[in-house]
Amino acid sequence: MPFFQEIKINEQTTAYFWKISEDIHWLFENVQLNEKSSSRLETMSSIEHKKGFLAVRMLLQHVDFTDFDLFYDAFGKPHLEDKRQKAKGKSLELNTQHISISHSHEFSCICISNQSIGIDLEKRKEKTLKIAPRFMDISHLENLSEADKIAKATVIWGVKESVFKLKNEKGISFPNHISESPFQLEDKKGKAQLHFNKITED
């Protein structure tokens, strides 16, 4: 079972990663799906998307939840049933009503916390750099090599996607409402602000 990594972000927040190496049939046979998820899976045309979807459910089971504990609000934001569960093999008891989900290529991840959160996985690709003017301040890419431009644009896209998932309200625009403070790739961290509906949040 290719559970890949657990990253403890703080006392209340942990991210879990799954490296997808199984075939679609193995994943399907080893997850429990509710009726809505089964119907949703059937509508997916991409095998890659199906595997990412199922790997997320494998991660839920890894931390003692199932697909039946997962639900989505009117804006499409995922939540877990409000209960206290213990992660496998861990003594820390997590209040796990908040969850964020992402999958990209051969990885899926979930982030679980007792506060609202957002997480995003992205593979570096040239396309992200080409569309960078649509979602970011391209002055933040000045004086960088082509590879570093792709890397930084990918990071900024992921940051903005995470902020959007955290707030998840209709009308939020990446270029108009989410801004990133200048940072260097080697910083390994950064700061973003959401300016929406006359409210500013860090």
Regions found by a protein language model. Name each.
Residues 1-202:
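Core catalytic alpha/beta fold that binds nucleotide/phospho-ligands
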